[in-house]
């Protein structure tokens, strides 16, 4: 009975694929999953007939601050037709009323120092303390004492043979590797 069910299932699959015209799937289809060549839901055919405007809206052809090459500004409107002057009138406003006389008076005073102006201008903050001088003279003597310097060097070496314990961090040679395996 099991063989009959399997045989009937195979016949149904073959029959259903023949009804579907047996469309062959391409194995090398490079399109990403989910991307289809037709418009998304909610897009109508009017968008495809929508023509783009030749004029860039909202862009104003004025030189940027700090650019002084006059030859590059000869034909600013060569590619775009600025038929509407409303944009230019909106953005080209007089800046004089925006500046308050109080600010101009304050900026011209020499008393108006910023915090950065009060900082040291030389590179003395990069120098170590012993060049400028120590606040504690005994501390300076300890640092400059050669006996202290050599004792620090002697203590920094591996003291495993002198009773100190240093854990082994890894295999030191090939013999240790062979013994480990």
From Swiss-Prot:
Residue segments, region Disordered: 159-181
Propeptide residues per the UniProt entry: 23-29, 44-54, 68-181
Disulfide bonds: none
A Gene Ontology biological process term: neuropeptide signaling pathway
Tissue: Periviscerokinin 1 and 2 are expressed in central brain, antennal lobes and gnathal, thoracic and abominal ganglia. Periviscerokinin 2 is also expressed in the retrocerebral complex (at protein level).
Domain of life: Eukaryota
PTM summary: A pyrokinin potentially constituted by residues Asn-158 to Gly-170 has so far not been detected and might be completely absent in ants.
Protein function: Periviscerokinins mediate visceral muscle contractile activity (myotropic activity).
Ranges of compositional bias, category Basic and acidic residues: 169-181
Keywords: Amidation, Neuropeptide, Secreted, Signal
Signal peptide: 1-22
A cellular-component GO term for this protein: extracellular region
Location within or outside the cell: Secreted
Protein name per Swiss-Prot or TrEMBL: CAPA peptides
Principal location listed in the UniProt entry: secreted
Positions bearing Isoleucine amide: 41, 65
Organism: Camponotus floridanus (Florida carpenter ant)
């Amino acid at each position: 009975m099991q063989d009959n069910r399997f045989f009937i299932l195979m016949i149904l699959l073959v029959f259903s694929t023949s009804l579907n015209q047996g469309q062959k799937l391409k194995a090398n289809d490079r399109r990403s999953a989910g991307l289809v060549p037709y418009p998304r839901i909610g897009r109508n055919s009017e968008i495809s007939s929508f023509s783009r405007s030749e004029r860039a809206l909202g862009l104003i052809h004025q030189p940027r601050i700090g650019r002084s090459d006059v030859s590059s500004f000869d034909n600013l409107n060569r590619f775009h037709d600025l038929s509407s002057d409303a944009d230019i009138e909106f953005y080209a406003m007089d800046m004089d009323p925006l500046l308050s006389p109080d600010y101009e008076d304050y900026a011209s005073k020499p008393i108006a120092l910023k915090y950065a102006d009060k900082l040291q201008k030389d590179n003395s903050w990069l120098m170590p303390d012993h060049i400028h001088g120590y606040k504690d003279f005994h501390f300076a003597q300890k640092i400059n004492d050669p006996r202290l310097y050599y004792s620090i060097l002697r203590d920094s070496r591996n003291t495993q043979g002198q009773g100190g314990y240093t854990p082994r961090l890894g295999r030191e040679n090939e013999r240790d590797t062979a013994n480990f395996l």
